[in-house]
């Protein structure tokens, strides 16, 4: 069976070594030594210059904290083409998602349509760097500055991505990332919040720790968003293998690029200035019927791509279902092909043959 992705498991002896440290420290959670070590190592690996990272227990909690701090119950301009967590976090935090359609080439929010969606209730722009492809950061920053809005980037897919020689996590007021087991770098389950402002860092920190600033001081409202030492142990075991993981995925991407027939398929256009991370391989069919036919043929031989992202989020039952033509069209026709470390050539070849036929 070939799934759309496969979790990278580090050598078990390396993971056991980290777990033995947890036992030696007799410390399982509450900002332990392994969590703090992983924060430091990630900052170095990602070459963060201005931002600091706070590790959390999953990839959605950072979004919820960002929206609690910056959304303030207002209208959030956002994309309908993302994983459901992006919209769910907005609604969960009692904010209102205002969907802006996407650019059909880059698949990110169409920056030219943002200003017309701004009202006196708008507090924030929440945009997703889809499949690791950056939004038009400069234009979004200009709009936010002009209208005194905050910017949150859902960078769940973006571990290792650089934009104009800087980590993608350096942009926006807050950026968030997922370290779920399906991601390039993972901690089994986990996530990170990246922030430049010292004041906003402090607010984000106490927000993920019940509001604590020290054992007996409370600086504000908080929840339990802390990463455990077991999660950090997995992250510390995976991180040394990132070069191998990226190289392997690039080889698979190169094979797809070289062998797929793009006369009947479209590819996502990467934005100029991006150093991509080979996180997903989406292809866009000419029609939903051709996608479904191809999907059924792949499934018949044990190959399971995913319809990321389907449906378009403006179709969710708990939001105002206002049509978004580009997002709905792309969502119905896009398929992410299997992509993970150490894919076998025979599997890649079979996928290409079926898709091309």
List PLM regions with ranges.
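Short N-terminal helix/helix-N-cap motif within the alpha/beta-hydrolase-1
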Residues: 64, 81, 135-136, 160-161, ...
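Hydrophobic/aromatic ligand-binding patch that stacks against planar heteroaromatic rings
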Residues: 88-90, 143, 230
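PLP-dependent aminotransferase class I/II
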Residues: 35-41, 45-54, 112, 124-128, ...
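Helix C-cap/helix->beta junction micro-motif
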Residues: 93, 146-147, 301
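Conserved PLP-binding active-site segment in aminotransferase class I/II-type PLP enzymes
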Residues: 1-71, 127, 145, 332, ...
């Amino acid at each position: 069976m070939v799934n759309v992705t496969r979790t990278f498991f580090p050598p078990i002896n390396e993971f056991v070594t980290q777990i033995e440290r947890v036992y030696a420290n007799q410390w399982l959670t509450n900002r332990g030594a392994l969590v703090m070590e992983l924060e430091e190592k990630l900052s170095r690996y990602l070459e963060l210059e201005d931002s600091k990272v706070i590790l959390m227990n999953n990839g959605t909690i950072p979004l919820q904290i960002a929206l609690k701090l910056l959304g303030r119950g207002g209208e959030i301009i956002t994309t309908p083409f993302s994983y459901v967590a992006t919209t769910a976090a907005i609604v969960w935090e009692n904010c209102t998602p205002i969907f802006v359609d996407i650019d059909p080439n880059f698949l990110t929010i169409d920056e030219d349509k943002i200003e017309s969606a701004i009202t006196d209730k708008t507090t924030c722009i929440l945009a997703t760097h889809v499949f690791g492809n950056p939004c038009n950061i400069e234009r979004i920053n200009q709009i936010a500055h002009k209208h005194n809005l905050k910017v949150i980037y859902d960078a769940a897919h973006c571990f290792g991505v650089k934009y104009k020689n800087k980590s993608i996590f350096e942009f926006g007021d807050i950026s968030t990332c997922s370290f779920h087991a399906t991601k390039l770098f993972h901690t089994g389950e986990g996530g990170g919040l990246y922030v430049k402002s010292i004041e906003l860092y402090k607010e984000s920190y106490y927000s993920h720790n019940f509001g604590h600033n020290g054992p007996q001081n409370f600086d504000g409202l908080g929840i339990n968003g802390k990463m455990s030492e077991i999660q950090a142990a997995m992250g510390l075991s995976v991180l040394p293998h990132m070069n191998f993981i990226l190289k392997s995925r690039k080889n698979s991407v190169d094979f797809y690029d070289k062998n797929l027939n793009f006369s009947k398929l479209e590819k996502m256009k990467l934005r100029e200035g991006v150093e991509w991370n080979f996180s997903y391989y989406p292809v866009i069919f000419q029609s939903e019927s051709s996608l479904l036919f191809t999907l059924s043929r792949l499934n018949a031989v044990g190959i399971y791509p995913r319809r990321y992202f389907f449906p378009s989020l403006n179709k969710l039952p708990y939001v105002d279902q206002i049509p978004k033509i580009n997002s709905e069209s792309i969502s119905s026709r896009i398929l992410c092909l299997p992509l993970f470390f150490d894919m076998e050539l025979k599997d890649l070849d079979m996928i290409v043959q079926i898709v091309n036929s």
